[in-house]
Structures are given as C-alpha cells and as structure tokens.
Amino acid sequence: MVDSSYFNRSSTNIIKYPIITDKATRLLENNQYSFIVNPYSDKITIKAAIEYLFNVKVIKVNTCHLPKKKKRVGKYLGWKSHYKKAIVTLSQGDRINLFAEN
C-alpha cells in the first residue's frame, strides 16, 4: 500500500488536469472521468491520488500513452510533447464535480 503522506505532497504532480472533450463528457454518463497524468506514474499511484484528492472510491483505472505530434509554425517544424491519459471509473454513488456551479 502507498503511504498517504506521500500524496499530501505530490498528488498535484501526479494528476495534472481533467480532460473536457465531447468523448470525455459522454464518459461521464458511465461514471468515468478522464485526466492528463504524469507520464511516469503507474495505475496504483493514479488510483491512490484520485482517491486522496477527491475523496471517492476508484474501481478501475485505464491508461494510455498518446504519441507526440508534429506542429508547424510558419516554415519551422516542431513537436508537441507526448502525454499520458487516464480514464478513471468510480463506484456507483461517487461523483467528481468538474464544472463550477453558479
């Protein structure tokens, strides 16, 4: 088991930000949330960080590495860096509030 004091310091380094796209909002109906995470973190630390930050019960974590892509600015060619995406499935009664309520 991972020590909880570790997540006190580094949970924000593991979970970068949530993904808000059409596909990600469709996944919200199935109680699945998408996040961009640190590319070097594994499923166990992602699960523990989500449970610590949002106080929810995580059932499953699916991850995938997305490749770097070409980016052209004028005549110069560069690369957008690669990143890691995690799709987190929560238990039936839990919920993460991603959108601000007015």
Curated annotation (Swiss-Prot):
Its main location: plastid. It is found in: Plastid, Chloroplast. One of its GO terms (cellular component) is ribosome. InterPro entries: Nucleotide-bd_a/b_plait_sf (IPR012677), Ribosomal_uL23-like (IPR013025), Ribosomal_uL23/eL15/eS24_sf (IPR012678), Ribosomal_uL23_CS (IPR001014). Signal peptide: none annotated. GO terms for molecular function: rRNA binding; structural constituent of ribosome. Keywords: Chloroplast, Plastid, Ribonucleoprotein, Ribosomal protein, RNA-binding, rRNA-binding. Belongs to the universal ribosomal protein uL23 family. NCBIfam families: PRK05738.2-4, PRK05738.3-4. This is Large ribosomal subunit protein uL23c. It comes from Trieres chinensis (Marine centric diatom).
